Amino acid sequence: SDLAFGHLAYEVDDIYALCAHLQAQGVTINRPPRDGRMAFVRTPDNISVELLQHGDALPVAEPWASMPNTGKW
């Protein structure tokens, strides 16, 4: 049977640092962490991955706060 799922999710220690690292490696940030709490990226295998800030959201910061969504997640 075919298994289907919407996305994977990971809790991370510093969502801004991880998103910056992934972006530097050429990963598209589909939904930037504008709120300091949540982001979505898409893997080269077309899997949507949700990143969640561990604990409280980080303070809202640029460049993330004004970055638009890219594609879909």
Which residues fall in each region the model found?
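Short hydrophobic/aromatic beta-strand micro-patches
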Residues: 9-11, 42
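Eukaryotic phosphotyrosine signaling hubs
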Residues: 3-7
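Vicinal oxygen chelate
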Residues: 16-73
